[in-house]
A protein has these predicted regions:
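Surface-exposed, charge/polar-rich loops and edge strands
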Residues: 1-182
């Protein structure tokens, strides 16, 4: 399901905006903003809709005001899942006008908001004149690039094998020339 192109009518839900902390884009520090929307009707399916990169304020005492969807909007885009940080995957929410989180842990966010969110995030690609840029644009690799990377790794493995053999042969010759056993 991840990476799949989707189309849905996103209806804003009366829940706070989620701001993923410690994001950078074009040399600026800020947040990735998400809005909870319903994308299905029977049963209602809730999802996080990525709103884009929101530049942070000079002080961390307050959160930036985020422009959100205010009415149902037909959205096309891709589904993706944020990879978990192996050192810290906890949500660590800070409540305010929105919710500042350190990691996008959907299961903990479900508990915090008392809802059931889809395990993937919807990144729209059809929002015209939108206030925020989208820093991550998935670019699929062509088969030629995959083949190129495979050749590159194969050549690196071959060079490593060759260097290892040269070192072992030199060590063996040195040991034999000094009268010792290999």
């Amino acid at each position: 399901v991840i990476g799949v192109k989707v189309q849905a009518e996103a209806k804003p839900e009366p829940l706070p905006v989620v701001l993923l902390d410690n994001q950078t884009f074009q040399g600026k520090v800020g947040y990735l903003a998400y809005q909870v929307v319903s994308v299905g009707q029977d049963p209602i399916t809730l999802a996080l809709l990525e709103l884009g990169f929101v530049e942070g304020l000079r002080t961390r005492d307050s959160l930036p005001t985020v422009t959100t969807l205010t009415s149902p909007t037909n959205v096309t885009g891709r589904l993706y899942r944020k990879s978990m940080n192996p050192l810290s995957s906890e949500l660590m929410p800070e409540m305010g006008e929105g919710i500042r989180v350190q990691n996008l842990n959907i299961s903990e966010l479900n508990e915090l908001l008392n809802v059931e969110l889809m395990p993937a995030v919807l990144q729209p690609d059809n929002l015209e004149n939108w206030a925020y840029p989208f820093p991550w644009n998935p670019l699929p690799l062509t088969s030629a690039k995959h083949f190129g990377y495979a050749v590159q790794w194969f050549v690196m493995a071959g060079v490593f094998l060759l260097l290892t053999m040269v070192v072992c042969i030199r060590w063996f010759r040195k040991a034999v020339s000094q009268g010792g056993e290999a």
